[in-house]
Amino acid sequence: MALYGTLQLSHSLGLCRNQRFCNPENSAMRRRLHISNGPLSLGVPLGQHGFSNILLSNYLRRPICSVPCRTTAFRCHSFSASGKAIEPAVKAVTVVLTKSHGLMQQFPFVYKLVPAVALLVFSLWGLVPFARQGRNILLNKNDNGWKKSGTYHVMTSYVQPLLLWLGALFICRALDPVVLPTEASKIVKDRLLNFVRSLSTVLAFAYCLSSLIQQTQKLFSETSNPSDTRNMGFQFAGKALYSAVWVAAVSLFMELLGFSTQKWLTAGGLGTVLITLAGREILTNFLSSVMIHATRPFVLNEWIQTKIEGYEVSGTVEHVGWWSPTIIRGEDREAIHIPNHKFTVNVVRNLTQKTHWRIKTHLAISHLDVNKINNIVADMRKVLAKNPMVEQQRLHRRVFLENVIPENQALSILISCFVKTSHHEEYLGVKEAILLDLLRVISHHRARLATPIRTIRKMYTETDVENTPFGESMYGGVTSRRPLMLIEPAYKINGEDKSKSQNRAAKPTAEQENKGSNPKSKETSSPDLKANVKVGESPVSDTNKVPEETVAKPVIKAVSKPPTPKDTETSGTEKPKAKRSGGTIKSTKTDETDSSTSSASRSTLEENIVLGVALEGSKRTLPIEEEIHSPPMETDAKELTGARRSGGNGPLVADKEQKDSQSQPNSGASTEP
C-alpha cells in the first residue's frame, strides 16, 4: 500500500536564497519542484525517492517581511508501506490517546492539576537527589559530606519549602473553577482551599525565616570566640526571634482563617492568671531566665560565687535553662542545680570577669628587730615596683607598717597590690613569687618573724629583794639560780581556770581567819612561813625547776602541825637564858617581835597565795613537769629541819613567852614574904 502526499508552500517563504543565480546542477531539483506564484505544490512519490532527494535545508530562509498567520500554509501528505506487525500497537495507542483526549475535553482543570501534582512530587522526592547528582557531576564531589554541605542546606531550607508552596497554590488554582452540585459542597470546597492556601503560605515563609535565623546563629557561634560574653546575648536574641516568628505565623494563620486574635488574647489573659496561680514557680523561673539572658550577669563556662540560703556555692556555669534550673559544676566536680529566680534575689560574684587579682597579706616582724623595720619596708616596696606583673599605674600598690599587734608586740606590715591577669592559676604563681621575694628581704636583713610571747618572771620575797645585789637582778646579764614563773597571755586563760584558782585561793583565807581567833597560832605560824618560803627556794636552786606545790602548800601545813618534841627540847635549853633578863625588857622585845612577825607573815602569805594561783593557771596551760616529787611526810620533815637550821625565832619566842608566864608567879611568890 502506498501513501501519497502533497506539500504546499507559500511563495513568500522564499525557498531559494537567490532565484536569479541558479546552477545547472540544480536542474534535477527544478524538475522535481514546481514553483508558481500561487501556493506551491509538490508531488513526490516518497516511497521511491524519499526526503533525501529534496534538499530544502540549503534553500529555506525566513521571510524578509512579516507574513500574517493566515497567509502561511503548510500541508504535507506522505505515504509509505507499513508492516502488519505494528498495526495492533498503533491502534491501541491511538485508542488510549483518543480516550484521554476526550476525558481532558470533559474536565479542563486536569490540564492545570497534572503539572501542579508533578511539581509537588518533584519537590518531595526529586529535588534533593537531583541536586546531589548535579553537585557530584559538576563539582566532582562524593556523597560523604552531602548533608553538611551548603547546597543541601539551601535546597532543604529554602528551595524545597518554596516549591511545595507553589505546588499547593497551583493545585488550589486548578481546583478553584470546579463546580460542585450542592451549595454545601461549594462552601466546604472554598474553606478547604482557603485553609490550604493559608497554611502553605504561613508554613513556607515561617520555615524559611526560622531556618535563616538558625543558620545565622550557627554561623556566628562557629566564627566567634567561645569565651566571648556576647555569645549568650546572641543565643538569647536568636531564640527570641525564632519564637516570635512562629508565634506570628500562628497568629497570621488564625487571621487568614477568619478568627479574631483579640478574643484569643482576652481569653489568654484569664488563662495567664490561672497559670500564674497554678505554676508560679515555673513562670518565675522562666521570667528569671529571660532576665539572665538579657542582662548577662554570667554566661556559660564562667566561674561564679554566690550564697543561697546560707549555702556557699562556687563553681563553673554549665547550663542556663529557660524552664529548667541552672546547672553549676562545683569545685569538687559535683553538679549543683539552682532555680533561676534564686540568682535574681541574691548577690552573684563573677570571678571570671575580674580584670585584676588582688594580693593582700600581712607579715609580722618581731619587736626585737624594730630598728630594721624601715629598711625592710623600703626593700619590700622595691620588690613590688620591679615586678612586671604588678599593676603600677591604674591601681594602688601599698607597703606600710600598719599596726603593732598587742598580743605579742609584733610589727605588722601591710602588703597590697594587684596582679595584671584574669586567670586564677597565673595569679597564684605571681603571688607565690612575690611572697618568696618578700621573705628573702626579711632574711637578708637578719630579721625574724614574730611568734607568740611567754613572760618569765623571777620570784622574790621581801628579804630576798633586800639582800639580792643589782647584778643578779632581772636587769643584769648574770643568770640567777632562783625560782622562775611562766605566765601565759591573758587571752589563753579561760574562765574555767580562773574559777578553779579562786576556789583554791579561798582555802588559805579561811585558815587565816582561824589564825586570827587564836593569837598563839599567829605567833607560831609567822616564823614557820618564813622558813617554808626559804625551804621552797632551796630545791629550785638545785634543780632549776618551778616547785609549784612547795610554794603554796607549806602555808597550810605549817599552821596546822603541832610542835615536835625536838622543838620543846630546844625551848627548854633556852629557859635559863630567859630568866636572867629582866621581865620588863623581855615583854617589850616580845611585843616588837610579835608585831614584826605578824606583818611579815601577812605579806608573805598574800604573795604566796597570788603566786600559787598564777602557778596553778600556768600548770593548766603549760606542760610543766616536776622532776622531784616527795611524799607529804618527807616534805614536813624537811620543812621542820629547815626551820631549825635557819635559826628562826618563831618557836623560840613562843617558848620564851611560856617561861615568862611561869617565872612571873614564881617571882611574885618570892617577893611576898
From Swiss-Prot:
The record's InterPro entries line, in alphabetical order, gives: LSM_dom_sf, MscS_beta-dom_sf, MscS_channel_2nd, Msl2-3_C, YnaI-like
Q: Which residues carry this modification: Phosphoserine?
A: 571
Consequence of gene loss (knockout):
Msl2 and msl3 double mutant shows abnormalities in the size and shape of plastids with enlarged chloroplasts containing multiple FtsZ rings.
Arranged from A to Z, the UniProt key words for this protein are: Chloroplast, Ion channel, Ion transport, Membrane, Phosphoprotein, Plastid, Transit peptide, Transmembrane, Transmembrane helix, Transport
Q: Where is the transit peptide?
A: 1-75
Renumbered to this chain, region (Disordered) spans 492-673
Bias category Polar residues: which stretches?
Answer: 661-673
Has UniProt tagged this entry with the keyword Ion transport?
Answer: yes
Q: How does it sit in the membrane?
A: Multi-pass membrane protein
The question of whether Chaperone is a record keyword is answered with no
Report TM segments.
107-127, 152-172, 193-213, 240-260, 264-284
Tissue specificity statement from the Swiss-Prot or TrEMBL entry: Widely expressed.
Protein function: Mechanosensitive channel that opens in response to stretch forces in the membrane lipid bilayer. Controls plastid size, shape, and perhaps division during normal plant development by altering ion flux in response to changes in membrane tension. Acts as a component of the chloroplast division machinery.
User: What protein name is recorded for this chain?
Assistant: Mechanosensitive ion channel protein 2, chloroplastic
Organism, as annotated: Arabidopsis thaliana
